[in-house]
Amino acid sequence: MSAIQNLHSFDPFADASKGDDLLPAGTEDYIHIRIQQRNGRKTLTTVQGIADDYDKKKLVKAFKKKFACNGTVIEHPEYGEVIQLQGDQRKNICQFLVEIGLAKDDQLKVHGF
């Protein structure tokens, strides 16, 4: 008869947690860009998921200057600090974040109509 060599239990997810430290910081986190309807034709664009390493107030200042819109940083109970901009700035924000190297194109998730 053949002897069974491997009698140890196997955890299929054990190796998945070992490789996490090899990834650069922020590669698995997504930046969510959403649009919300206000009254009439007015809209708000929200940006959520930017790492805490970056100063969000300075980012808002750059967004406001580049896109000629108003914006602020709000504290959301579920998502933490969220950037809020007036108008539909989804494409502009995507281009800007990739341009300055803050995020890669596959890290950006754009939501909305």
UniProtKB/Swiss-Prot annotation:
Instruction: Please indicate if the UniProt record lists Protein biosynthesis as a keyword.
Output: yes
PROSITE patterns under this entry?
Answer: SUI1
Q: Which residues cross the membrane?
A: none
Residues under site feature: Binds 40S ribosomal subunit:
41, 65
Q: Which PANTHER family match?
A: EUKARYOTIC TRANSLATION INITIATION FACTOR SUI1
Coiled-coil blocks: none
Instruction: Tell me which species this is from.
Output: Homo sapiens (Human)
**What is the recorded name of this protein?**
Eukaryotic translation initiation factor 1
Q: Which UniProt keywords apply?
A: Acetylation, Cytoplasm, Initiation factor, Phosphoprotein, Protein biosynthesis
Q: Which InterPro entries match?
A: SUI1, SUI1_dom_sf, SUI1_euk
In this UniProt entry, the residues modified to Phosphoserine are 2, 9
Q: What is the lineage of its organism?
A: Eukaryota, Metazoa, Chordata, Craniata, Vertebrata
Q: Which GO terms describe its cellular component?
A: cytoplasm; eukaryotic 43S preinitiation complex; eukaryotic 48S preinitiation complex; multi-eIF complex; nucleus
Q: Which GO terms describe its molecular function?
A: ribosomal small subunit binding; RNA binding; translation factor activity, RNA binding; translation initiation factor activity
Q: Which residues carry this modification: N-acetylserine?
A: 2
Q: Name a single GO biological process.
A: regulation of translational initiation
